[in-house]
Regions:
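Amphipathic helical hotspot of TIR/SEFIR-family domains
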Residues: 69-70, 74, 80-119
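Conserved BB-loop
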Residues: 39-70, 84-92, 132-136
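Helix-turn-helix repeat elements of alpha-solenoid scaffolds
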Residues: 179-193, 214-228, 251-265, 295-304, ...
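Alpha-helical linker/edge segments of TPR/alpha-solenoid repeat scaffolds
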Residues: 253-258, 290-296, 329-340, 369-373, ...
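C-terminal interaction surface of TIR/SEFIR-family domains
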Residues: 1-46, 110, 115-193
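Amphipathic alpha-helical repeat scaffolds of TPR domains
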Residues: 167-182, 201-214, 236-253, 274-293, ...
Length: 433
């Protein structure tokens, strides 16, 4: 489904590429914000913008000058995505100053910084206005998205466009709040009903559909998630994120031919050059599923290698990092796994992150990889308490912990420390039997 004309009539078209220009816009970000950026990437592609996404072009460790050579230098505009979680001062300062210099020297180049949360900006960035997307944690939408597109083209918004943008901002914010409220209360039916409400923010970008699908996956409503995400894919055929989530839902459900279908989706993305940590991470997960069925160590090693590739490409990506660590432990490469786990804890710390289930249980798993059973059990409990209705997330976390304990051989008392936070899963399974 193309973006509705009601929205397109206000959206500026991409500028023509002049001599030497290859891209309409260059996106610069840290991998921790990759899902948000993928949604921006998808909508820009849908609007026929040529987009340079450095995560797809660059392997971690490359020098900035090298990656800018064919990216930023040959782009009409640059968007720098900033959040507190990605506030690596060296990276932010380098990328910001590079784009600022380019904008100063070339009036045709449009530099648009974007912030994803309400925290204060770094001091060096105080002189430039940032586009504020703090109300859109899962991807751009609403009037802010329209304003961003105007900013990268350098066009001015008409009064009608401004009024339209303000209305869309309110509609999108209302939908996001409704979706997250339904996730908190475990109300999958309301999530599906919201998707079928068919108001304009659902038709503009895939971000709301992805949020709905991901919430259903977290609630272990895999059938509903798959059906919804297939609809999002049909509406936004160029979008990457719905396909990733569709594959994840299939892998989590694990019925009949689900694993093969998930691998086909991800292998196609991989073959098309999509090597971002999310694609690699979910693909790696399906190889682990194959190992659980086959017992073939080659499948386990393939899983670990894809996770490790994702982590090398994005060293701040804790999801691929912790899985590279844990799969190394399962391969009897304990020292390697413990070293990666230690590095992750140096990056994110050893304290629970309020409201962030996955970061908190990542800390727990890194502690488990290092045989710190009491601390790991305590951290798992804090993660469960943050998201008590996310049974799908709990099952995935517990499954990994069980595999690790089989390899690490804790004492019965140590095993009980890890199992205690997950007792509700056993009770729930007994009730559903």
């Amino acid at each position: 489904m193309p973006i509705p004309q009601q929205w397109l009539q206000f959206a500026p078209k991409p500028r023509d590429l002049a001599n030497g220009e290859k891209w309409n816009v260059f996106l610069s970000y840290r991998s921790i914000n990759r899902n948000w950026v993928l949604n921006l990437y998808d909508v820009l592609k849908e609007l026929d913008y040529k987009v340079f996404l450095d995560q797809y072009e660059i392997i971690g460790g490359d020098e900035l000058i090298q990656r800018l050579q064919d990216g930023l230098t040959n782009s009409q505009s640059g968007i720098l995505i900033w959040s507190t979680a990605a506030s690596d001062s060296v990276w932010v300062d380098k990328e910001y100053q590079t784009m600022e210099t380019r904008a100063t020297r070339d009036p045709r180049f449009k530099f648009v910084p974007v912030k994803l949360d309400g925290k204060p900006l770094p001091i060096f960035a105080a002189n430039r206005v940032f586009e504020d997307f703090s109300s859109y944690p899962d991807g751009p939408n609403g009037g802010e998205l329209l304003r961003l597109i105007y900013a990268i083209t350098g066009e001015h918004m008409s009064k009608d466009a401004i009024d339209f943008a303000n209305k869309q901002s309110q509609l999108a914010a209302d939908m996001i709040n409704e979706l997250n409220a339904a996730k908190i209360t475990g109300d999958a039916e309301s999530i599906v009903q919201l998707y079928h409400s068919n108001i304009l923010p659902w038709k503009t970008t895939a971000s709301l559909g992805c949020t709905a699908g991901e919430n259903l996956i977290k609630l272990r409503k895999y059938n509903e998630a798959i059906e919804l995400l297939q609809g999002v894919e049909n509406d936004f055929p160029k979008a990457i994120r719905p396909r990733q989530l569709h594959a994840l839902a299939l892998a989590r459900r694990g019925q009949n031919d689900d694993l093969n279908q998930a691998q086909r989706i991800l292998a196609k993305l991989y073959a098309a050059g999509e090597r971002d940590p999310e694609t690699l991470g979910i693909f790696a997960r399906t190889w682990m599923d194959r190992y659980n069925k086959s017992g073939d160590t080659a499948d386990l090693r393939q899983s670990r290698n894809y996770y490790e590739d994702g982590y090398k490409r994005a060293p701040d990506d804790n999801y691929t990092g912790i899985n590279a660590a844990s799969k190394s432990v399962l391969l009897d490469e304990y020292e390697k796994g413990a070293a990666i786990a230690k590095k992750i804890l140096e990056n994110i710390g050893t304290q629970a992150v309020p409201g962030d289930y996955w970061t908190t249980v990542t800390i727990a798993e890194a502690l488990l990889d290092q045989k710190q059973y009491a601390d790991a059990g305590n951290m798992y409990q804090q993660g469960i308490d943050m998201a008590p209705m996310e049974y799908g997330s709990h099952e995935s976390t517990w499954g990994q912990a069980q595999l690790l304990m089989e390899k690490l051989k804790p004492t019965p008392d140590e095993r009980a420390l890890i199992a205690k936070p997950f007792m509700h899963l056993l009770k729930r399974a007994a009730q559903n039997a």
